[in-house]
């Protein structure tokens, strides 16, 4: 037999899912500007284009090498920060992607 017993709760409140406060859902604001217009992020001078919501294509430079970053961003206290979901392509990989883009489009449509 256990030495200690659990105290019975005499509380009338139920701590079930009904009592939990649900956080307000955040919806990404769509910009009124056309998607093809580049915008300057301001922090590091990277040029970016909005794909949808908070998904963006950015041109970054790291250690003297440029890359194309396709990434999902998130809003933290009014500051837009890069998320984990995304890919960074070298310029060679980006050019190869553009070469096969038409074939990929045809495969999607068929």
UniProtKB/Swiss-Prot annotation:
GO MF annotations in UniProt: single-stranded DNA binding; transcription coactivator activity
PANTHER family: RNA POLYMERASE II TRANSCRIPTIONAL COACTIVATOR (PTHR13215)
Family matches, as SUPFAM superfamilies: ssDNA-binding transcriptional regulator domain
Name listed for the protein in its UniProt record: RNA polymerase II transcriptional coactivator
Keyword Flavoprotein attached: no
Pfam families on file: PC4
Claim: DNA-binding is one of the keywords in the record: yes
Record's GO cellular component terms: nucleus; transcription regulator complex
Entry keyword set: Activator, DNA-binding, Nucleus, Repressor, Transcription, Transcription regulation
Organism: Drosophila melanogaster (Fruit fly)
Record's compositionally biased regions (Basic and acidic residues): 17-42
Family designation: Belongs to the transcriptional coactivator PC4 family.
Function field: General coactivator that functions cooperatively with TAFs and mediates functional interactions between upstream activators and the general transcriptional machinery. Binds single-stranded DNA. Binds specifically to the NssBF element, a short nucleotide sequence of the 1731 retrotransposon, to repress promoter activity.
Subcellular location: Nucleus
Origin: domain of life: Eukaryota
Main location: nucleus
């Amino acid at each position: 037999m256990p030495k200690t017993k659990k105290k019975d709760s005499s509380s009338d409140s139920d701590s079930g899912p009904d009592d939990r406060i649900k956080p307000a859902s955040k919806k990404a604001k769509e910009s009124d500007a056309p998607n093809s217009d580049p915008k300057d992020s301001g922090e590091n001078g990277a040029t970016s284009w909005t794909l949808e919501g908070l998904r963006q294509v950015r041109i970054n430079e790291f250690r003297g090498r440029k890359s194309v970053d396709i990434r999902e961003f998130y809003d933290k206290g009014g500051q837009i920060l890069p998320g984990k979901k995304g890919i960074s392509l070298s310029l060679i990989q980006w050019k190869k992607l553009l070469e096969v883009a038409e074939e990929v489009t045809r495969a999607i449509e068929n």
